[in-house]
């Protein structure tokens, strides 16, 4: 009888452990309620006249979601070239930047980013630049991106280590807007 009880307790604890959601998985899940919605953003740090962002309407769209990949186009004015791609594998989240041209072809600088070095938190993931990024854009080798998401807001942030380069844009997730924008690619 004692062995049966121990076996049952072991089975319950294994089932409970499997049922727990990792921080990285919870981060990916946080996008799900926003699928198909658009949100307006504002630059909260690093914006300056002539940077291509300041003074433009900033929109994000959670265009697609599944448990392993989330695509979030980032529209800057009429420029529909940018999509943030979050991928989940081996309990880590990866961020890649997909850049396309207006004719639907890939930009020569695309798919840069990095993978979180740990499972992060349910509301924040950090992405140091990976080797692929360094090969593609040598000056971006010291980039660190971090993204936050909670019930009220989404932020995309970039810091270039060793410089004063900081860029942050924040989106209000409590106020979805109507848009028919779609990325160029």
Where does each model-flagged region fall?
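Tryptophan-anchored aromatic micro-motifs
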Residues: 22-49
């Amino acid at each position: 009888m004692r062995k049966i009880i121990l076996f049952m307790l072991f089975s319950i604890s294994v089932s409970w452990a499997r049922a727990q959601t990792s921080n990285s998985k919870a981060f990916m899940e946080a996008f799900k309620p926003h699928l198909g919605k658009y949100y307006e953003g504002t630059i909260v740090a690093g914006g300056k006249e002539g940077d291509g962002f300041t003074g433009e309407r900033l929109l994000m769209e959670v265009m697609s979601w599944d448990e392993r990949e989330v695509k979030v186009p980032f529209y800057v004015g009429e420029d529909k070239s940018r999509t943030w791609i979050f991928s989940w594998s081996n309990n880590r989240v990866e961020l890649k930047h997909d850049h396309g041209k207006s004719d639907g072809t890939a930009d020569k600088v695309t798919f840069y980013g990095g993978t979180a070095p740990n499972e992060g938190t349910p509301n924040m993931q950090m992405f140091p630049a990976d080797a692929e990024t360094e090969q593609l854009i040598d000056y971006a080798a010291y980039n660190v991106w971090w993204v936050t998401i909670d019930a009220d807001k989404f932020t995309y942030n970039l810091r270039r280590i060793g410089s004063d380069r900081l860029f942050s844009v924040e989106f209000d997730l409590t106020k979805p807007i109507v848009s028919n924008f779609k990325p160029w690619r």
